[in-house]
Each structure stands twice: as structure tokens, then as C-alpha cells.
Regions:
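Short amphipathic alpha-helices in soluble, non-transmembrane regions
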Residues: 4-7, 188-191, 215
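FabD-like malonyl-/acyl-CoA
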Residues: 22-190
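Gly/Ser-centered flexible loop/linker motifs
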Residues: 184-203
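Helix N-cap motif at beta-to-alpha junctions
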Residues: 1-3, 181, 210-215
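Helix-enriched interaction subdomains in cytosolic or periplasmic regions
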Residues: 1-15
Length: 215
């Protein structure tokens, strides 16, 4: 733990190419319960997980696991998530587009989560509860002991591949609407085919999906 603390302090001095969206504290732990929240597809970005992978061997183990996994090894998730630096915005856009594809994004997000969980576990931080949004539910189930890391990678790879296959060459889109399902249903009937009620997130938000033109 002391070695990890020293590495964290040392990392604060280095120049980071990406803005950090987290805060690390070495103070005494707070009282109360801890929840881990796992994000879904759409949270991916080029460079995700690179800082941890470069600084901590334990974090790299998750990427090594993915590289040797029968379902994700051929994808080379490490090269997709933190590829060589792009020369210009065109190259960066191409890298982003490749990572955004469902068959890549979902297992890559899983690898990042496994990387983070391994490091947090060694630091002694345990979750009392976990929740996930959409794809993140898979990693929450992994943390809860429902499936091991290899199974989580398998589910992530298969889920992403099946969703990509179902979408085909159709360019889809999603639209969040601040209303309830019963209000939006008659609107969809008037609009006609092409739009469906994909998510009923709650009494004040639904998500519609369909082809970009329909949305």
C-alpha cells in the first residue's frame, strides 16, 4: 500500500494528456458505506485507462488478461483504448470512431473497469454495494460475485458483437425525452415506423431510438 501511495504522489507531478475525472485522497477513510458505480457504453474515449496502465503493473494485468482472452484477445483492446498518439484531428477522429463501435467499446470498458477494480482492491477500498448503467450492470454483477473476470469479458464481447450485428449498416441514434412513457406512446404512433421506445428510465425520462433520419 505504501508503494502504491508513493506512485500516486509521483503521478501528481507528471504531465497528463487527459483531464482526470476522479480524485484520489490519502487521508483517513470516511465512515459510512461505499458504492461503486459502473458506466455504460458512451463513456469510452481514446486514452481511457492509459494513465493507470502506465503507472501500475496491477492495472496492466487486466489488459494482459483481455489480450489473452479467447473472445477479446483478437480485438487488442489495449491498442484500441490507448493507441499511438494521433498526428492530427482526422487520425484522432478515426481512432475515436473505431473505439466507439459496439463490438470494441463494450469489452474495452470492461477492461478499464477490471483494471480499476484490481487497483482499488489492492489499495484496500471495498464496495458495500454496486450499480451499473446499461452495460455497466455487467461489471456491477462481476463485482457482486455473479461472474468472474473472464466471464465478464466474454459477456462484454458477445453483447457488443451481437448489438453491432443487429444494427448492421444502419446509422442509429438515441434521443432522451423529458416525459413519461404513457405520454410518448401516442406521439410515436403518430410519427409512424422508425422510432421505438427503447428505455423507460423513470417517470420523467424516456429514450427513443431508431435510424438517424427518424430521430
Amino acid at each position: 500500500t505504501e508503494s502504491l501511495s508513493q506512485q500516486i504522489r509521483a503521478g501528481e507531478i507528471g504531465v497528463r494528456p487527459f483531464k482526470a475525472d476522479c480524485v484520489a485522497s490519502l487521508d483517513a477513510p470516511l465512515t459510512g458505506k461505499t458504492a461503486f458505480m459502473f458506466s455504460g457504453q458512451g463513456s469510452q474515449y481514446v486514452g481511457m485507462g492509459s494513465d493507470l496502465a502506465m503507472a501500475f503493473p496491477l492495472a496492466r494485468e487486466a489488459w494482459d488478461r483481455a489480450a489473452g482472452h479467447k473472445h477479446t484477445g483478437r480485438l487488442r483492446l489495449d491498442r484500441l483504448s490507448f493507441p499511438p498518439a494521433a498526428f492530427d484531428q482526422v487520425d484522432f477522429g478515426a481512432q475515436t470512431q473505431t473505439l466507439t463501435e459496439m463490438q470494441h467499446a463494450q469489452p474495452a470498458i470492461a477492461a478499464v473497469a477490471l483494471s480499476q477494480l484490481g487497483l482499488l482492491s489492492q489499495l484496500g477500498l471495498k464496495a458495500d454495494m454496486a450499480a451499473g448503467h446499461s452495460f455497466g450492470e455487467i461489471m456491477a454483477l462481476h463485482l457482486g460475485g455473479v461472474m468472474n473476470a473472464d466471464t465478464a469479458l466474454t459477456v462484454a464481447a458477445e453483447r457488443g458483437a451481437l448489438m453491432a450485428k443487429a444494427a448492421g449498416n444502419t446509422k442509429g441514434a438515441m434521443l432522451a425525452v423529458q416525459t413519461d412513457a404513457e405520454t410518448i406512446k401516442p406521439v410515436l404512433q403518430k410519427v409512424g415506423q422508425g422510432l421505438v421506445l427503447a428505455n423507460d428510465n423513470g417517470p420523467d425520462q424516456v429514450v427513443l431510438s431508431g435510424a438517424q433520419e427518424a430521430v
